Amino acid sequence: MCDQLSQFVVDKYVHLKDFLAKESCAELTAELKRLVAEKQTTQDSQCPKSEAVHGAMAFDKLLVDLLPHFERASGRRLYPTYSYARLYAPGEDLTIHTDRPSCEISATLTLGFEGDVWPIYMGDEGKANANKIDMVVGGAVLYRGMDKHHWRETYTEGK
């Protein structure tokens, strides 16, 4: 069993470093900022300070393009359900939670940021014994969304 698959099976998540090319990340970041500028985004109750978009064409395409890579890392046949992109604002946090059934296996990718790295945390039972994962541009975490508690502390940097 490959290292990524082993980690996913045992830990219920795998950190995929250098997963997406920096050029692709820059293009997708520019697309998200364009959607924000054109007011094609919204806020949600989970992160009300931030702008988000559900089902944008560029991110839906990314979901399909990355599917085979996520299937290899998880050892499972996966069915894409939806894409969701968010431009986090300073002062935002992501409250500890698990995901709904349509997010049985989820991925988070970092496409761009200003300032310091903003980690995501993965834990089994709340915040005790959680793992901090530094998310750099091009990095991803594939995880069992209904099983892994995940969150981000307050974001103090730029966007």
Outline where the language-model segments fall:
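Non-heme Fe(II)/2-oxoglutarate
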Residues: M1-S74
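Secondary-structure boundary/capping signal
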Residues: S24, Q40, R77-L78, D93, ...
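Generic beta-strand or strand-like secondary-structure segments
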Residues: D65-H69, Y84, S106
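Short helix-to-loop capping/linker segments positioned immediately adjacent to catalytic or ligand/cofactor-binding
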Residues: A73, E92-I96, R152-E153
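Conserved active-site beta-strand element of glycosyltransferases/polysaccharide synthases
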Residues: L87
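Catalytic core of non-heme Fe(II) oxygenases with the double-stranded beta-helix
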Residues: P90-D147
